[in-house]
């Protein structure tokens, strides 16, 4: 690193040595001291410039200690700054008020307000002061709360000066000395000399070089040229006279201006007249307030010299007048008087400011006039000898003119109103000349706010549209929402993004810029776009809610399906366990039919003692069920279903009868109803006699039960394959009964009934042969059945029922309801009711009729 101080001190010493030698100090000691001080200052400058602290703004060096916020000076807010400024102005105004009340005045009045109104004084105080000194506006008179015409002079003086009202017969206090007795005739207001306006020379008639030469403009007969008396204020001290006190200031103001400078631009010179507390030999307070007049607005009593409205000639004091002003700038909603058109055409979006109206007659352009009292006291301008106050000079010349009503009466009451541009009219806009600036500021502020709001609205509008586009169209299709109209190339297919009304489309084509809606003509388009945006947002929220609902429904459905799958798996597992426990006495369960028939139905008939009340179960017990059954999983519209079911029940009934009377009797209740539904033409006894063991078997089948080496106990049943539902139309599913033999056996049955022996109505033989009638055996009740060979199939032992043949329609009296049938016994005679056959119960129709058994 090296010695930084040494390296920093070298250039400083060299530079300052050269400068010191060039200057050439007077003494070596002085030179040494100066060089040392310069080196120290230079080293300090360079050290502060090259120090590491100077790179702290780059984040390289410097102290890492944070600044304490308490040590830093707190920044003053705008509101605090305004409040501090107003407080300072209030203090200054209070001091000026006290000074003005003590030293200044105009004709017995004051140049500052006296507290009738406590609100902010936002009028132009210099303008009001100038108008009051010029006697164009009434001064701020002291107001009285009460006034009586019977008050004496000393009572009026006491009340005006703020003292308590004395008694009428009280001795008045000592009056001040009358200075008018010591004045020369020229200063005596009761004399016949000219008035005080001739004491000063008007500024407008003098040039800058003529200010010191008064003899050029004043006549020798002027009172200023006459020798004053020794008691005259001018003779006593002319240099200190108030008439010459502001001469240097006036010359300075004239030197900075031009000769053609207007009177309003140039600050006029104020002159303070001698203080005279008397007017016409009486106190000035008594002279002013002896004919007091009440202000109709503030209800205070003032001297009769009040302002008069230009329109209706009503009195109004100056404190009330300065409070009346224009209303604040506002939109031109309720503005539009046909009689008073706006001075300049206003745009729709700009603010307007209406002139103040008269509080009495509501005439616009409120203004007042003022006629001063017939004397002068206090401050005056040195150019008041000229108009507009020249007309009032005759009223202040002498006592006779003061007492003469002919001079002052013509202007007291007017029959017509004065024009607003009259030179004697003072309007509210003159009192507040900044109304135009306030209006322009308000308009500028409104325009700035409108521009900011428009920019914010456009930014939000464009950002919202862009975000919507990115969320909906992920393929890069951008909607040109920042322009007024849609282009065909923007969408890729020449299709607008949405239907818009014609007015919006036309306005969009007319305003094809980045910031629509800046002008007032495009406000409606912005509102339409906002409504469209709100509608699109509502639609988007609705679609999102619908998608959420669908997603929730799908989730719930998946949960339900999962639960159902678990439940089915548990049921299958239980069924498999139950099958493995029971053993080899059962056929394998049909797992596909668990939902239709149930698992427990196969094991419901335990040990061959349970009554089978179901027509088609999935599994069966070979001990009490036939070797074959028809499953109910076939189509319900199969016309052969009920026939196959009934046939299986009949075969089961006959096969169970071969086992023994106990099994047959137990199985009869479940098959009796099916037998009755099939045919009432034959009895169960005849069916038992005609049945042969192993008569209906397919080729290649044996009567062994699955898993057993013994023949099936019910070997004479219909043996189908393990599928339980063989295809329709196969020989194994054809009808097992010859209904033609049923018709042919009607005649032998009638003969059998006559003989009283058992009848044999069915004989199953070859498939293509007609069923033979059984011989009548009235003596022998039984006939040995002929055993068919095992290789004869179902097609050889049955006859097929063709679809073209009429089928048998059986009227079921009980409907499809299955009820337990009474016990059936085989009888030998024909007197049993069960063996009887009614011919009328059998009918033949042309067509198929399906009667459901379920």
Curated annotation (Swiss-Prot):
Q: Where in the cell is it found?
A: Cytoplasm
- Compositional bias (Polar residues): 44-57, 191-220, 228-242, 254-266, 624-634, 646-660, 777-815
What's a single GO CC term here? cytoplasm
Compositional bias (Low complexity) spans? 20-43, 391-401, 596-606, 675-695, 706-735
Q: Where is the composition biased (Basic and acidic residues)?
A: 65-103, 328-338, 546-563, 635-645
Residues of the region (Disordered) are 1-103, 162-242, 254-274, 328-350, 381-415, 482-529, 546-839
InterPro entries noted in UniProt: Sip5/DA2 (IPR039301)
Q: Just give the chief location class.
A: cytoplasm
Q: Per the record's keyword annotation, is Cytoplasm included, yes or no?
A: yes
Instruction: State the UniProt keywords alphabetically.
Output: Cytoplasm
Query: What is this protein's function?
Result: May negatively regulate the SNF1 kinase.
- State the family it belongs to: Belongs to the SIP5 family.
Put simply, this protein is called Protein SIP5
């Amino acid at each position: 690193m090296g010695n930084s101080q040494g390296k920093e001190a070298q250039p400083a010493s060299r530079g300052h040595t050269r400068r010191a030698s060039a200057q050439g100090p007077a003494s070596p000691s002085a030179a040494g001291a100066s060089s040392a001080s310069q080196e120290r200052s230079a080293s300090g400058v360079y050290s502060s410039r090259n120090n590491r602290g100077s790179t702290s703004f780059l984040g390289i060096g410097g102290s890492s200690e944070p600044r304490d916020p308490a040590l830093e000076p707190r920044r003053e807010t705008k509101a605090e700054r305004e409040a501090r400024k107003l407080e300072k102005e209030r203090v200054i105004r209070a001091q000026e008020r006290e000074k003005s009340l003590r030293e200044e005045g105009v004709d017995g009045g004051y140049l500052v307000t006296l507290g009738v109104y406590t609100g902010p004084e936002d009028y132009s105080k210099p303008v009001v002061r100038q108008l009051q000194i010029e006697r164009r506006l009434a001064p701020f008179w002291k107001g009285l709360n009460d006034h009586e015409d019977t008050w004496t002079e000393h009572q009026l003086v006491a009340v005006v000066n703020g003292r308590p009202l004395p008694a009428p017969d009280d001795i008045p206090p000592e009056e001040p000395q009358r200075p008018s007795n010591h004045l020369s005739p020229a200063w005596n207001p009761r004399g016949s000399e000219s008035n005080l306006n001739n004491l000063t020379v008007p500024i407008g008639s003098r040039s800058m070089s003529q200010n010191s030469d008064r003899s050029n403009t004043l006549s020798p007969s002027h009172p200023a040229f006459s020798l004053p008396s020794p008691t005259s204020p001018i003779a006593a001290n002319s240099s200190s006279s108030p008439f010459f006190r502001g001469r240097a200031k006036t010359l300075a103001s004239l030197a900075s201006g031009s000769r053609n400078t207007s009177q309003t631009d140039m600050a006029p010179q104020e002159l303070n007249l001698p203080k005279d507390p008397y007017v016409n030999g009486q106190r000035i307070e008594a002279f002013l307030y002896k004919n007091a007049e009440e202000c109709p607005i503030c209800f205070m009593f003032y001297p009769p010299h009040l302002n008069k409205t230009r329109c209706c000639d009503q009195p109004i004091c100056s404190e009330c007048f300065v409070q009346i002003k224009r209303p604040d700038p506002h939109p031109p909603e309720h503005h539009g008087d046909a009689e008073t058109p706006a001075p300049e055409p206003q745009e729709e979006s700009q603010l307007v400011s209406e002139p103040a109206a008269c509080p009495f007659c509501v005439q616009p352009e409120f203004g007042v006039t003022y006629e001063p009292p017939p004397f002068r006291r206090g401050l005056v301008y040195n150019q008041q000898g000229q108009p507009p106050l020249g007309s009032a000079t005759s009223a202040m010349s002498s006592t006779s003119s003061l007492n003469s009503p002919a001079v002052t009466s013509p202007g007291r009451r007017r029959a017509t109103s004065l024009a607003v541009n009259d030179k004697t009219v003072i309007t509210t806009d003159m009192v507040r000349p900044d109304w135009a600036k306030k209006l322009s500021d308000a308009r500028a502020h409104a325009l700035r706010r409108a521009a900011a709001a428009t920019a914010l609205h456009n930014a939000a509008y464009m950002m919202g549209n862009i975000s919507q586009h990115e969320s909906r169209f992920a393929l890069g299709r951008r909607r040109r929402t920042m322009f007024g109209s849609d282009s065909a190339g923007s969408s890729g297919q020449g299709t607008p993004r949405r239907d818009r009304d014609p007015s919006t489309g036309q306005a969009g084509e007319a305003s094809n810029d980045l910031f629509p809606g800046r002008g007032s003509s495009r406000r409606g388009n912005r509102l339409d776009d906002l409504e469209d945006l709100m509608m699109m947002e509502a639609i988007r929220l609705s679609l999102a809610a619908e998608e959420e609902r669908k997603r929730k429904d799908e989730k719930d459905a998946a949960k339900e399906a999962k639960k159902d799958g678990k439940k089915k798996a548990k049921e299958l597992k239980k069924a498999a366990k139950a099958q493995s426990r029971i053993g080899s006495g059962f056929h394998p369960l049909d797992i596909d039919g668990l939902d239709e028939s149930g698992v427990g139905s196969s094991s419901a008939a335990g040990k061959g003692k349970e009554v089978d009340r179901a027509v088609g179960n999935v599994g069966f017990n070979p001990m009490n069920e036939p070797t074959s059954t028809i499953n109910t999983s076939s189509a319900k519209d199969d016309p052969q279903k009920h026939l196959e079911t009934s046939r299986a029940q009949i075969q089961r009934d006959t096969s169970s009868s071969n086992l023994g009377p106990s099994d047959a009797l137990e199985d009869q209740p479940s098959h009796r109803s099916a037998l009755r539904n099939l045919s009432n033409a034959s009895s169960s006894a005849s069916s038992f006699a005609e049945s042969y063991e192993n008569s209906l078997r397919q080729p290649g089948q044996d009567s062994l039960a699955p898993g057993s080496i013994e023949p099936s106990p019910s070997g004479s049943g219909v043996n189908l394959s393990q599928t339980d539902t063989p295809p329709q139309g196969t020989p194994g599913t054809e009808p097992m009964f010859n209904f033609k033999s049923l018709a042919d056996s009607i005649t032998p049955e009638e003969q059998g009934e006559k003989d009283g022996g058992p009848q044999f109505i069915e004989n199953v033989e070859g498939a293509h042969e007609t069923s033979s009638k059984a011989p009548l055996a009235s003596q022998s009740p039984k006939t040995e059945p002929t055993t068919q060979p095992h290789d004869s199939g179902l097609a050889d032992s049955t006859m097929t029922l063709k679809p073209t043949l009429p089928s048998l329609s059986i009227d079921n009296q009980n409907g499809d309801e299955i009820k337990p049938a009474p016990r059936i016994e085989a009888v030998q005679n024909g007197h049993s009711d069960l063996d009887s056959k009614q011919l009328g119960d059998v009918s033949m129709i042309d067509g198929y009729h399906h009667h459901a058994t379920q």
